[in-house]
């Protein structure tokens, strides 16, 4: 079977990751002790994508949990699904990274990284045919961003032909934990551009907006935000975990979604987003799902897709529904909003349908868009970065760990290049290239 090894790094990564395991354990009928209590053969058919089956019929997540301080790990271990994970797969330091990317990437994190790689290697040896890795982390802190990107590059060295997929929580302007977030995020993006195959950009600000506006929560907690993220992660990985009509694995997804290797930053979305109490008052239809899912307010990244154009889109519909209706709706959306899809990639919307809906819903859909509007997110971080870097504010924390200012300059220019690449493809039209060819031909004739 095509296995995936899951890694969660840092506080945010561990909280989102653990929530993800709770959700998919529930979907596959795995109880907190790892026993199977489900009622459908479909739940077990592809269970070994994410779980190892132990000799005593216990299903164990194929996961490595990493942090530079013990706190988060303790709360995972004492949480509802704490007994699910293999005890040896908790790897933590004692010092913490103090929201410092350099500590996570060069000093503290580098000391712990070999222990993590040992666990990852062990998990990979249990695999029949490993398809790739997924990492959950945030880019604003120290461990998830610094050590997370270090792990990615080390794993890349050792498994160069496997897919590397990350769920990265981007720092947002309104919800800020630390002053140096723009530094940490820029240094991380610099790594992600080079070393990952697909990155789902999740943004706290967008999640807060969804909680306020759509779910009508007056005081959203991190628990509510993580609930949204886990619903999205569960949706994105559906076609890997359940037999569906379009069985995507990570590589097929990458082939469909990434037209240029550097432009692999996706905007996820989820529908239906209804507040907890109001679900019973409405029946969902495929047209409603499709409508909601392309709505800017349902995006988990704080970018407006109407400000850019979609290079590619993948959608996953879950629940009993007719394929024909789904295809008709998707075509309708594309023809109505054709200006928002680049015309030089025909058939750039892919649809997968899975018969098993998420817990508590009759039908649901997940959206993955590769849109040029994601540049707004990078622009925002880049502006904050430049404002501080111009004054060299807080830089001594990083140089003190052995970093060079040159690295900051490189990361900054790499991010700006990324923004202009997105802009270039946003402006490109189908006949741009032809004009260039005509010019060349004239020169040859001359």
From Swiss-Prot:
Motif placement: MREI motif: 1-4
Disease note: Facial palsy, congenital, with ptosis and velopharyngeal dysfunction: An autosomal dominant congenital disorder characterized by non-progressive bilateral facial palsy, velopharyngeal dysfunction presenting with varying degrees of hypomimia, rhinophonia and impaired gag reflex, and bilateral ptosis.
Modification after translation (UniProt): Some glutamate residues at the C-terminus are polyglutamylated, resulting in polyglutamate chains on the gamma-carboxyl group. Polyglutamylation plays a key role in microtubule severing by spastin (SPAST). SPAST preferentially recognizes and acts on microtubules decorated with short polyglutamate tails: severing activity by SPAST increases as the number of glutamates per tubulin rises from one to eight, but decreases beyond this glutamylation threshold. Glutamylation is also involved in cilia motility. Some glutamate residues at the C-terminus are monoglycylated but not polyglycylated due to the absence of functional TTLL10 in human. Monoglycylation is mainly limited to tubulin incorporated into cilia and flagella axonemes, which is required for their stability and maintenance. Flagella glycylation controls sperm motility. Both polyglutamylation and monoglycylation can coexist on the same protein on adjacent residues, and lowering glycylation levels increases polyglutamylation, and reciprocally.
MF terms in GO: GTP binding; GTPase activity; metal ion binding; structural constituent of cytoskeleton
SMART domains to which the protein is assigned, alphabetical: Tubulin (SM00864), Tubulin_C (SM00865)
Tissues in which the UniProt entry reports expression: Ubiquitous. Maximal expression in breast and lung, where it represents around 10% of all beta-tubulins. Largely decreased expression in most cancerous tissues.
Named cofactor requirement(s): Mg(2+)
UniProtKB keywords: Cytoplasm, Cytoskeleton, Disease variant, GTP-binding, Isopeptide bond, Magnesium, Metal-binding, Microtubule, Nucleotide-binding, Phosphoprotein
Family: Belongs to the tubulin family.
Superkingdom of the source species: Eukaryota
Modified residues (5-glutamyl polyglutamate): 438
Binding site for Mg(2+): 69
Role summary: Tubulin is the major constituent of microtubules, a cylinder consisting of laterally associated linear protofilaments composed of alpha- and beta-tubulin heterodimers. Microtubules grow by the addition of GTP-tubulin dimers to the microtubule end, where a stabilizing cap forms. Below the cap, tubulin dimers are in GDP-bound state, owing to GTPase activity of alpha-tubulin.
Protein name (Swiss-Prot/TrEMBL): Tubulin beta-6 chain
GO CC annotation: cytoplasm; extracellular exosome; intercellular bridge; microtubule; microtubule cytoskeleton; mitotic spindle; nucleus
